[in-house]
């Protein structure tokens, strides 16, 4: 989860500087929302728990093309700064059968107008690129379960320093399990085996895609995350969206959020001198790399647009795009991304991820920083427990790309979370990426089988696969039994 309200902002202007959100935003929040206290939000998934918990957090404009082989409708790098009078365009991308529709929704003074354009896609091309088979399904499942498992096991060390991780978990660090979770004030807010807000919000995106028949709609996601912030998932026993990050909290509780989430996010970012770039967007977007992975433009624009609903810093968009493009490329398994043995050519994948993600950055210096995190090969370079900076979006993205270079899921995720810092978020992104690379069978069974809400998650996956078959004639169901064995 991104840095929570009241816990010291973890968004950073660079590796060496941090900037907190300035000013009191309470006058711009809806009066009925929970107000952040000095120590954080009183939120809990466990009945009777009173521990104060919130989290550290922190996406940009772009040209919105019609996915599945691109149709441009928006501007490239560096959109205009939002003002109270600005008209913002929120692109929604829908796929009907093998046709693509990009609808842009303009918002001004509470009014909406929509225009849609359609682009036909050659059926043979798209189905060939989708490459639907049992291997693909196992990688999709690896992405989803990898995210949730990495999140849940990462909770064990979240907000601890590396030294504290060793003190608490040294005896069992080679075989960490959910039941090893220490019972301190923070961790008692979640039951054993539960994931946190990172995966909650990923599932919000997943449900939005399913219930809108493949359309990726920032407005719909905005409504869902606002509702989740107030109630969580009641069907799972939640009474609030546990662990909301600072940037997310202030954005979704602005009065203008549902009318224009992009503008709301930009105003919150502006109050922080446009320097806060925390990880609350990249943590949730892995599922966008799965949906219609055959077209990278589709993935890129959806990742950027959903990130931007709460996080206005371009680095937040760039990091979300990099992660989602990597997942999509691995699902495609195109020859240019494989070596002679059929294994992934990680260098080629990184270079292509950089090409897409760097579109959201304006200067060579910012692009160089992006690449330095993508190429990271040693965890110590990321300084994941660095005081006051644990929630920087590039630290989380860097964790994912470090994991991409590993070959053992359990060992890699354990090593990563034992670095401390924002471990659940780093674990979620790394778990999604490595799970996609190594498939779901690479994830330790003691982690997948002991996820608290495993069966609930499986029903959502089942709904997605059936939606893709019924609406888009893309059939994953022969390779999916409805549950993990």
Language-model features, listed with the residues they occupy:
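Structured, active/binding-site neighborhoods that engage oxygen-rich ligands
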Residues: 2-47, 51, 55-76, 84-485
């Amino acid at each position: 989860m991104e840095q929570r309200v009241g816990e010291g902002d973890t968004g950073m202007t660079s590796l060496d500087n941090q900037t907190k959100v300035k000013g009191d935003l309470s006058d711009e929040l809806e009066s009925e929302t929970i107000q952040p206290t000095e120590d954080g939000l009183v939120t809990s998934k466990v009945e009777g728990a009173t521990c104060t918990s919130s989290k550290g957090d922190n996406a940009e404009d772009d040209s919105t093309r019609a996915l599945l082989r691109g149709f441009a409708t928006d501007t490239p790098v560096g959109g205009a700064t939002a003002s109270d009078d600005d008209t913002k365009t929120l692109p929604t991308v829908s796929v009907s059968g093998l046709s693509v529709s990009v609808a842009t929704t303009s918002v001004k003074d509470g009014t909406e107008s929509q225009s849609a354009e359609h682009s036909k896609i050659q059926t043979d091309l798209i189905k060939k690129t989708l490459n639907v088979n049992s291997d693909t399904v196992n990688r999709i499942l690896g992405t989803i379960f990898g995210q949730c498992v990495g999140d849940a096991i990462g909770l064990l060390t979240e907000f601890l320093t590396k030294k504290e991780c060793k003190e608490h978990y040294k005896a069992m660090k080679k075989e960490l399990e959910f039941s090893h979770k220490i019972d301190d004030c923070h961790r008692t807010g979640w039951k054993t085996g539960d994931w946190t807000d990172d995966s909650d919000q990923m599932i919000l995106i997943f449900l939005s895609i399913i219930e809108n028949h493949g359309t990726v709609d920032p407005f719909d996601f905005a409504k869902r995350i606002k509702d989740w912030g107030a109630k969580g998932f009641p069907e799972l026993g939640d009474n609030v969206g546990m662990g909301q990050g600072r940037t997310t909290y202030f954005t979704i509780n602005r009065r203008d959020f549902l009318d224009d989430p992009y503008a709301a996010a930009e105003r919150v970012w502006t109050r922080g001198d446009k320097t806060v770039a925390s990880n609350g967007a990249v943590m949730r977007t892995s599922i966008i790399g799965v949906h219609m992975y055959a077209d990278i433009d589709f993935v890129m624009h959806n990742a950027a647009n959903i990130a931007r609903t709460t996080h206005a810093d371009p680095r937040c968009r760039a990091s979300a795009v990099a992660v989602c493009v990597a997942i999509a490329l691995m699902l495609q398994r195109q020859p240019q991304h494989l070596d002679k043995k059929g294994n992934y050519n990680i260098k080629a994948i990184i270079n292509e991820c950089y090409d897409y993600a760097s579109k959201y950055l304006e200067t060579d210096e910012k692009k160089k920083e992006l690449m330095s995190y993508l190429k990271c090969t040693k965890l110590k370079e990321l300084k994941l427990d660095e005081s006051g900076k644990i929630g920087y979006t590039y630290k989380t993205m860097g964790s994912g790309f470090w994991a991409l270079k590993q070959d053992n899921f359990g060992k890699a995720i354990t090593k990563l979370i034992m670095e401390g810092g924002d471990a659940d978020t780093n674990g979620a992104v790394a778990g999604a990426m490595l799970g996609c690379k190594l498939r779901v069978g690479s994830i330790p069974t003691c982690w997948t089988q002991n996820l608290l809400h495993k069966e609930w998650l499986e029903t959502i996956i089942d709904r997605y696969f059936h939606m893709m078959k019924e609406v888009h004639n893309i059939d994953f169901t022969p390779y999916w039994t409805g549950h993990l064995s």
